[in-house]
């Protein structure tokens, strides 16, 4: 990991709104981060007073796992770096965090041909290869039955997104702008690739590809399906690494995306904060980041070779998931449908009783702001801006 330039945004004193949140996740994503990375983050950024206990426990767990992290790299590092995706282009699921990417990923994960990042490997990424045979059953007993933000069922083997383990080993990820909320340059540089140096871009490419190599090694297959909303505006960068990659993009009504993402920020992401941002700042971030992510995807999707992109509408996928999966396999020319269709059908049968969260009505000022700032999103996929008629 190469150390990038220090983010330019300076810490500010921001005490508007209480730091109280309905925390739902006790563990921090950085508990098994690389020691060098965690020390660099602490050197570059201030941890606000309400989160110093959280920082203390990160330091403790990082210290406890340091030897085992070193041992995993010594045993598996060289083997992982030999893995190539030249003849096994990944399938990338793109879309906003709250647009149905998890539902789509869960369906794909039932295909016995495909490997994917599991929750176990996500949570214990830097020691997962070393410990999966004996620690995974232990972790399974302590995992919650559902995700805090949406009540989706989870277990140690359920699919997860690879930006999370990337944040444990690399500075080159926008997730650090979640942890250190005033440091938005991580999002700008490593999600939107704005103001990024060639050295930093090369660092992101190396670190990201190595995460995929580790996922492949863990699964015993180079055929991967990956769900990562942070990748949505990275089409160009992904094609530079994997020119024959397949893409599935899922979109949802923008009002629902906003409400669900704000809920995600307050129920789950806030439990990872190391710097305070107010609830109003969270709303600003949902709108501004959503606009940037979607608009960069729209500008870049034409770069994807014909036949390598399928776009899916969430409300249709929700009602006719099996038919949509069959269409995706056919349009992308994916092999193995005959073996996958049974397990995929079983998955959709298993989630028939699932109930989505219900949210309070949008404030009028937010409704108007979403109409204005997300206009391109409404127009591109033909969503109505009338809340009374939304589909």
What is each residue range found by the language model?
Residues 227, 238-263:
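Conserved phosphate-donor/acceptor-positioning beta-strand/loop module used by diverse small-molecule
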Residues 232-235, 255-258, 318-321:
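Flexible loop/turn segments at secondary-structure boundaries
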Residues 94-96, 225-229, 314:
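Short His-Asn-centered micro-motif
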Residues 93-110:
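Glycine-rich phosphate-binding P-loop
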Residues 1-72, 82, 193-194, 199-205, ...:
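PAPS-dependent sulfotransferases, especially Golgi type II membrane carbohydrate sulfotransferases
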Residues 71-93, 122-126, 131-134:
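N-terminal signal-anchor transmembrane helix
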């Amino acid at each position: 990991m190469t150390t990038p330039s220090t983010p330019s945004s300076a810490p500010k004193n921001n005490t508007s709104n209480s730091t109280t949140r309905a925390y739902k996740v006790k563990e921090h994503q950085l508990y098994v981060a690389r020691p060098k990375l965690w020390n660099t983050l602490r050197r570059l950024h201030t941890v606000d007073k309400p989160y110093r206990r959280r920082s203390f426990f990160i330091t403790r767990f990082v210290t406890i796992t340091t030897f085992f992290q070193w041992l995993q790299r010594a045993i598996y590092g060289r083997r992982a770096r030999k893995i190539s995706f030249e003849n096994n282009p990944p399938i990338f699921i793109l879309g906003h965090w709250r647009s149905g990417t998890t539902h789509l990923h869960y369906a794909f994960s039932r295909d016995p041909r495909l490997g994917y990042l599991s929750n176990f490997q996500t949570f214990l990424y830097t020691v997962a290869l070393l410990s999966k045979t004996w620690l995974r059953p232990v972790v399974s007993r302590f995992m919650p039955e559902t995700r805090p933000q949406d009540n989706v069922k989870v277990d140690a083997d359920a699919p997860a997104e690879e930006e999370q383990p990337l944040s444990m080993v690399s500075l080159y990820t926008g997730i650090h702008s979640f942890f250190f909320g005033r440091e938005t340059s991580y999002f700008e540089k490593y999600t939107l690739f704005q103001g990024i140096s060639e050295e930093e871009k090369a660092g992101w490419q190396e670190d990201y590809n190595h995460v995929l190599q580790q996922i492949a090694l863990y699964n015993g297959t180079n055929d991967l399906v990956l769900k990562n909303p942070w990748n949505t505006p990275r089409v160009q960068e992904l094609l530079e690494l994997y020119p024959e990659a397949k893409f599935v993009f899922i979109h949802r009504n923008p009002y629902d995306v906003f409400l669900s993402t704000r809920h995600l920020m307050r129920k789950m992401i806030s439990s990872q904060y190391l710097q305070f941002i107010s609830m109003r700042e969270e709303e600003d971030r949902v709108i501004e980041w959503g606009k940037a992510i979607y608009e960069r995807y729209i500008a870049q999707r034409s770069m994807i070779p014909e036949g390598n992109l399928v776009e899916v509408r969430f409300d249709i996928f929700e009602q006719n998931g099996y038919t949509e999966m069959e269409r995706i396999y056919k349009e992308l020319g994916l092999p193995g449908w005959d073996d996958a269709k049974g397990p995929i059908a079983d998955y959709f049968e298993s989630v028939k009783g699932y109930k989505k969260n219900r949210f309070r009505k949008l404030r009028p000022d937010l409704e108007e702001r979403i109409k204005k700032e997300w206009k391109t999103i409404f127009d591109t996929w033909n969503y109505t801006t009338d809340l009374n008629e939304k589909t």
